[in-house]
Amino acid sequence: MAETSTIGSGVALVGCGSATPSQRISNDQLGQRVDTSDAWIRSRTGISARRVIGPDETLTGLSHQAAANALTMAGWEPESVDLIILATSTPDDLFGSAPQLQAILGARQAVAFDLTAACSGFLFALITAAQFLRTGAMRRALVIGADQLSRWVDWDDRRSCVLFGDGAGAVALEATSAAQNGLLGFQLKSDGSRGDCLNLPQVQNHLSLVAGNSHQQGGFKPIQMNGQEVYKFAVREVPAILQTLLKATNTAPESLDWLLLHQANQRILDAVANRFAIPQAKVLSNLAEYGNTSAATIPLMLDEAVQDGRIKPGQLIASSGFGAGLSWGAALIRWHGPI
């Protein structure tokens, strides 16, 4: 449903940060492992390279770097943070990595938890955090989108291994007056009936416990994806949810300063932009360098564009995330920057 509540305060995005692994793998390098080429990958995805987490790196470590950078931009002390939400489907600890992140940051006053919504995770977490702030229950929140899908990819499957990379991005949210509100509207959707076209399923190994009793010991298979179905889902549902969002907020596409989509495939980015006649100069993309970093793509791109001066305070951004679940969402954001 559209966000229309005015209870409590507004929410301002006052800081951002990002981090990526040191290992960079090019398309040509992947072509040494699987039957593919730079031209084949770029023509179908727009991806030229991706960052892959190394043996001495962790998702929590990347998340810490991104969150610390967001704190620095916002000018906050870690102890002033009330809430930390880590959007990830690939935590270091399946029970949750957000509490470890809280400890490393020194954010002793913050409640911290993971939120899992795959590639939609960052937007879902952003909107969740905003509701805590708007009720007045909390004042400051860190939202981190981070994933290490390289650990769950079949590196011998050229259809999927070329797509994914690792990374982390973070934003700092602060409760503000309604006049400074930076989250102007949102839409969230889920459809589990189509979830089998993109998943990371369990693999079960039979284990005999005691006489007459058995158990299926759990593990996970590599990422399973029907690329054609995911593409059709994205080019159909993303324009539709953005159209609903723009109508609900009485926003004309031409009034947008930027279109910031989940970085999954350049063809999807182009199709959505064309649907709204948004010029390519307004479409933010770093897909070529990083690939699909799942929950990290939107905050990673946001931070890059803020750091290089493309995104300026007061500018209007339409953002949409989509992915496994199936899940998808959209948000209309006005970038604020440090207060």
From Swiss-Prot:
Residues 263-267 are annotated as: ACP-binding. It comes from the Bacteria. CDD domains: KAS_III. Pathway: Lipid metabolism; fatty acid biosynthesis. It is found in: Cytoplasm. GO terms for biological process: fatty acid biosynthetic process. It is an enzyme of class 2 (transferase). The active site is at residues 119, 262, 292. One of its GO terms (molecular function) is 3-oxoacyl-[acyl-carrier-protein] synthase activity. Keywords: Acyltransferase, Cytoplasm, Fatty acid biosynthesis, Fatty acid metabolism, Lipid biosynthesis, Lipid metabolism, Multifunctional enzyme, Transferase. Its EC number is 2.3.1.180. GO terms for cellular component: cytoplasm. Its main location: cytoplasm. It catalyses: malonyl-[ACP] + acetyl-CoA + H(+) = 3-oxobutanoyl-[ACP] + CO2 + CoA. Belongs to the thiolase-like superfamily. FabH family. HAMAP family: FabH. The last Arg residue of the ACP-binding site is essential for the weak association between ACP/AcpP and FabH. Homodimer. Catalyzes the condensation reaction of fatty acid synthesis by the addition to an acyl acceptor of two carbons from malonyl-ACP. Catalyzes the first condensation reaction which initiates fatty acid synthesis and may therefore play a role in governing the total rate of fatty acid production. Possesses both acetoacetyl-ACP synthase and acetyl transacylase activities. Its substrate specificity determines the biosynthesis of branched-chain and/or straight-chain of fatty acids. This is Beta-ketoacyl-[acyl-carrier-protein] synthase III.
